[in-house]
């Protein structure tokens, strides 16, 4: 869309609001829209990710993970969570579980029947496979995950429950 924007617009969000959100029917209305939406800031990185994902159906991995970070994952043999062939080839050092990397896209907060908090985190990775990880034992005050940021996560897997982690977000490490 950058090729459509000219010097009358401050940024892409200004252009989008003037042309798409409030569609002008004539040139006079376009000029009014340009003045009305003059204060629009640029799209944030999260807005760009959401727009590209919604429009194309593919997560824009290049906006989240740079080549250096991706190479670090490869050098350490940390597979993406959606890669079934490599996922269980790299066990975690202590206890049960496996290490993989992923990008949280959505956090659904729920309660068990005993009124304990848990999260269902929808994640994606370079394989474009959406997975859900259940995070048990979440402290809603202390635990926090950032959406659209790469994490290394220690996960357990069972056929009945799928992916899960214990003790809130202690098994999640922010990488970017």
Where are these regions (language model features)?
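Sliding clamp-binding short linear motifs
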Residues: 1-90, 134, 161-176
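A residue-level signal for conserved active-site and pocket-lining positions in enzyme catalytic cores
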Residues: 56, 102, 148, 155
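Structural detector for short beta-strands of small beta-barrel domains
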Residues: 95-114
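Hydrophobic core residues within well-ordered beta-strands of beta-rich domains
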Residues: 98-100, 119, 151
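Short, charged beta-turn/beta-strand-edge "cap" motif at the junction between a beta-strand
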Residues: 106, 155-161
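OB-fold (S1/OB) nucleic-acid-binding surfaces
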Residues: 109-136
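Short nucleic-acid-contacting surface segments enriched for D/E, G, S/T with interspersed K/R
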Residues: 138-154
């Amino acid at each position: 869309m950058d090729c459509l924007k000219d010097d009358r617009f401050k940024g892409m969000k200004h252009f989008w609001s003037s042309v798409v959100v409030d569609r002008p029917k004539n040139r006079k209305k376009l000029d009014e829209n340009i003045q009305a939406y003059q204060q629009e800031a640029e799209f944030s990185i999260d807005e760009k990710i959401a727009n590209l994902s919604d429009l194309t159906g593919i997560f824009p991995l290049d906006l989240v993970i740079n080549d250096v970070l991706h190479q670090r994952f490869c050098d350490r043999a940390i597979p993406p969570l959606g890669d079934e062939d490599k996922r269980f080839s790299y066990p975690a050092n202590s206890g049960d579980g496996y290490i993989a990397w992923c990008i949280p896209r959505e956090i659904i907060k729920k309660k068990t029947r005993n009124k304990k908090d848990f999260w269902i985190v929808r994640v994606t990775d370079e394989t474009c496979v959406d997975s859900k990880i259940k995070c048990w034992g979440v402290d809603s005050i202390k635990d926090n995950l950032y959406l659209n940021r790469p994490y290394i996560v220690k996960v357990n897997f069972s056929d009945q429950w799928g992916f899960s982690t214990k003790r809130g977000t202690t098994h999640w490490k922010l990488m970017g």
